[in-house]
Every structure is written in structure tokens, then in C-alpha cells.
């Protein structure tokens, strides 16, 4: 996928697992362009539980990515982008399994 000059990639491994790649630099540039910075990170003990391939830990606050930025991110059917702390996270809608975490995008 290539949208607005930003590169992203979707890969499915041999077991059917999803691997998503959009670079930190691209995601950070979108956050800055859309004035979405200054978010506080999660406490370290909670942040370590935010791991690709695992469910989103219960009780972690997540926010929808504002539509102005969401429209510029790659779209993957069955997944949604969320803001968790200051990280950009791609989560499976039906299972809450984390497909991708891009740390400190909204710092």
C-alpha cells in the first residue's frame, strides 16, 4: 500500500497471522501534520503488556484515532487503529488481539 507518500505493508504468515508495517517516521509525520502530539505514555508496567500477538490488556484506555489522521493510515479489513497512551496500535476488532504497536507516535 502507498497512500499520501507513506509506505505500509500487510503480510500474512504461514499460520494466517497478520503482520502490519508502517514506519514510525511515517506515523509520527502524520501525528505532527495533524497536531496530534503531547499525549502521555503508559506507565512502564502497563506498557510492557502492550504486545503484538496478545490481546489488549483489560482496563487499558484507548482512544479512536481522529478521522483526519485515520483517513491517511492504511486500512485493513477487520482491524482498527487506536491510540493507547502515546502509541499507535492496530487491533483486531472481533478479538482485541494486537496486530501492531508503533511506540511514541503521539509523544
Give residue spans per PLM region.
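Low-complexity segments
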Residues: 3-107
Amino acid at each position: 500500500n502507498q497512500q499520501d507518500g507513506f509506505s505500509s505493508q500487510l503480510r500474512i504468515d504461514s499460520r494466517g497471522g497478520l503482520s502490519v508495517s508502517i514506519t514510525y517516521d511515517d506515523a509520527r509525520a502524520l501525528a505532527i501534520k495533524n497536531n496530534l502530539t503531547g499525549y502521555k505514555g503508559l506507565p512502564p508496567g502497563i506498557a510492557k503488556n502492550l504486545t503484538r500477538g496478545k490481546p489488549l490488556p483489560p482496563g487499558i484506555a484507548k482512544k479512536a484515532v481522529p478521522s483526519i489522521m485515520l483517513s491517511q493510515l492504511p486500512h485493513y479489513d477487520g482491524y482498527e487503529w487506536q491510540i493507547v497512551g502515546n502509541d499507535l496500535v492496530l487491533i483486531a476488532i472481533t478479538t482485541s488481539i494486537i496486530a501492531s504497536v508503533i511506540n511514541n507516535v503521539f509523544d
